[in-house]
């Protein structure tokens, strides 16, 4: 129908001429027209409308006409489609229509409608649909039973007529036709079964029936014989030809037709006894089951086939005694023909032999059933009457020769078993070993032959004669426009160049000497004499970065060392001069190729050399106090990084408390007393209980060595190098602790120091300090009475906090809480600074030999000058 929505009322109006008032189809012609419209219906509305029209029709002739024109097949297609799409309403409508149609068994056999309905009755999800399908199946079963009960009587009459005809007409038919017919029937049976298996099963089957059923009811044999054969034929749809043979063999008194007796000559006595046993044995056991009926009755034609196959195998192997020279005659699979003068075909089968003599053997009429006596027929014997039969009802075999002109000579060649074998396939290990020996011998001979080959020309080279070719009739590409097209194309496209090599050899290797990478110092020498960059910051702003950004490209040890040496050149303190980075490295590392690090450490003058080398350049401690100010102060060396005065910003002088004078805030406090080790605090260290500006303090407090390379009067690197981890900033002492009354470090190692006014910061950990208090290396300071600023404020003892790692870009600054007097805490981004004194641990040999260690600050051993004081 159309693609748009369908109105059933409009459809019924169009069909009004074919329908009555009740919706029933008027005539037979109308149902044909409606069926043609039903075939075109694609929408569910139109299909349901047509199904309801069929349901309203009551006239049987109209319904029969609907089935005949193809309505039943159409309903089958609709049923299949609706079952696939699981359309329950359409399925119910189709089942009602099928129930309404007068279907017969022949109709049900036409397609799989019955099977689909039975599946719906069992496996449908809808309960109403299952009930409807089961009702329809039961109705159809009743139709099948009623029709099958009326058919057996008619079948019996037909079979009796056919049996009578076969008995009367069989002797009159030519013998060759009978043989051809029996052969055509049994040809598929030959292909399916092998003669040996048939030969073994036949006697066992006969024995089963003879032993089990003979003792029960032998007197019922003549009564049940005919009835059983008829019932079995009805059940199993046996063909009439096996039934003819059954009936022919069933009557022992009748004269057997020649087709039946042709199987008996070679094995007469046992076969006849078996057949007699089969006839005597009742076909049904005492239970009377249908399966045993089939066992007893169905194999009767099968036994005939088995007998024939038994005969086939001995005759195929029998030699034909003609002339004593010809080979066997195995033409058993070829159907026989009545003409005696067709000699070429039976000899085409596979058989070994020599050239066949000129005398040609005619085809045997039936090689499968030939008797030994018939094979002994003499060549002189004339072909007698074709209708003449032997005493057993068989035509006598005769041998004739064709005329001289029709004689042919055939040559047969024996088939070699290894002719079609893959010779390259190895069969066993012996052959593989033999082949291996042959290949080794061949390789040896080839090598010996080629060893004396001087590769000289054996045949002199002769230039071949030049070929003289006629001039071409057509110049190739003379009229082609493609070259112009390509020329236009290449004006805007690069030409494709394929460069040929000068020679097929590999190119010469390019001379290349591996050169060790050049070490570029972190602080260049040319920039050291210039004044460091002064950055103007707000009071709460961040100070200079303790280390340059380039330090991350080198190991931290080398970066710190180089930064320290580079910074030491800038102020040019007393006794300071230019220093070479490589000299310091080689002096620290010694000669690792000649002496191991342990031997270097054991030398007595090793530490003295190190001190002499590092002290003049300000690497081991800060310079002396200039004019009472720390380095970088008003009287100190130039180039110290200054901070602008902030509100309440502490002064490094004696008044570092909240009431101190406003002045430039310097990062570097005055150095500690140099009474002890220049790298470690002596007895006068304010953090170890030494006297501060506020008075003496009690016993020593914990000390913690800060990371970094700078200290003393060395200024930090310029701000472009901010953001790296490590290095102390400001002028604090090398151990990272604040001096008396001053600030030690601000933000070393990238942590936020929480400072009060005048507070100082240790090695990169947070310290909460009171006014005038100084903080050690990130640990809680144990202070006695009298500590603090001039106003007597006791510092706030706060446990040390590990700093947080602010990982941001280097310019990122954190402004923190202001303490007493507004001093802010400042910090720089960078890595964690662990610190800690490792001098009591073994020296890291990798650090001593190579100058760096891959574990860096996480190493559990002592790195001199990094996680502890340098070696003395």
Swiss-Prot record:
A zinc finger (C3H1-type) spans 838-866. Residues 583-595 have a biased composition (Polar residues). Residues 644-655 have a biased composition (Pro residues). One of its GO terms (molecular function) is enzyme-substrate adaptor activity. The modification Phosphothreonine is found at residue 398. There is a cross-link at residues 179, 262 (Glycyl lysine isopeptide (Lys-Gly) (interchain with G-Cter in SUMO2)). Component of the PNUTS-PP1 complex (also named PTW/PP1 complex), composed of PPP1R10/PNUTS, TOX4, WDR82, and PPP1CA (or PPP1CB or PPP1CC). This is Serine/threonine-protein phosphatase 1 regulatory subunit 10. It comes from Rattus norvegicus. The lineage of its organism: Eukaryota, Metazoa, Chordata, Craniata, Vertebrata. The gene is Ppp1r10.
